[in-house]
């Protein structure tokens, strides 16, 4: 994933976080680099597609994928100098919220949880994985 982020940064001039977002979008879109107005170049798109094919996410658990994205985002945020309020919710906070939800709800009760400021989605994914 880091290779794809690097290619997008150099080719399009994206920040680390923007390149990570584009990379994740490309992975979701059948591991295919999207070209808009000729960017990235055909050569770079082929390089990106090769990197996406090498990243076999089916061999990882949901938690491993979440952590891979989290660590890549933390690296990108550090390199970009992101403001504190734009950074990912730490796992410790997610686990604390999940524990509180677990303690305050009935085990057989169906829950609906909404995070209207979802951002990266790390808080919700941490809660979901904890409550499963």
Could you say what each language-model-derived stretch is?
Residues 1-81:
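A short N-terminal interaction module
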Residues 11, 15, 30-31, 87, ...:
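Functionally constrained cores in energy, signaling, and assembly domains
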Residues 82-98:
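Conserved SAM-binding loop and adjacent beta-strand
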Residues 93-132:
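Conserved S-adenosyl-L-methionine
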